[in-house]
From Swiss-Prot:
Binds to the 23S rRNA. One of its GO terms (cellular component) is cytosolic large ribosomal subunit. Keywords: Ribonucleoprotein, Ribosomal protein, RNA-binding, rRNA-binding. It comes from the Bacteria. Residues 42-52 have a biased composition (Gly residues). Gene3D superfamilies: 3.100.10.10. Residues 1-13 have a biased composition (Basic and acidic residues). PROSITE patterns: RIBOSOMAL_L15 (PS00475). This is Large ribosomal subunit protein uL15. SUPFAM superfamilies: Ribosomal proteins L15p and L18e. Part of the 50S ribosomal subunit. One of its GO terms (molecular function) is structural constituent of ribosome. Residues 1-55 are annotated as: Disordered.
Length: 146
């Protein structure tokens, strides 16, 4: 076999539908749109969710709940992510952003207790879970709420 003898696998290369190019092509005249009706027209068709005039499902179901505009949004981070720092480092939200551990601080940073911490760190954050605070102190570190 030579390079010029290579051929694509059978059925892997399909030519596109060229509609409206004469009746002999099989896709002439109505261009595979059927006869008359909304879908045969330019720009025809119904919007998503339209059920032919029947009250659509999204309007039959009741509205529920509301958005609390006073809700605080904390950036959550597990303590196993803090193992990248050296012993006795003061870990602040600014340092976490600088090191790429988190990308953005909204209303503060909350430290969660998933994983293990091997380093002795001074961690400054807005909130701590009970498990996270215990694990930081067990590793010889300090917890400071800012």
């Amino acid at each position: 076999m030579k390079l010029h003898e290579l051929r694509p696998a059978e059925g892997s290369r399909k030519s596109p539908k060229r509609v409206g190019r004469g009746t002999g092509s099989g896709l002439g005249k109505t261009s595979a749109r059927g006869e008359n009706g909304q879908n045969s027209r330019s720009g025809g068709g119904v919007r998503p969710g339209f059920e032919g005039g029947q009250m659509p499902l999204y309007r039959r179901l009741p509205k529920r709940g509301f958005t609390n505009i006073f809700a605080k949004k904390y950036t959550a981070i597990n303590i196993d992510r803090l193992n990248i720092f050296e012993d006795d480092t003061v870990v602040t939200p600014e340092l976490l952003i600088e090191k790429g551990v988190i990308s953005k601080v909204y209303d503060g940073v909350k430290i969660l207790g998933n994983g293990e911490l091997d380093k002795k760190l001074i961690v400054k954050a807005t909130k701590f879970s009970k498990a996270a605070a215990e694990k930081i102190e067990a590793a010889g570190g300090k917890v400071e709420v800012i």
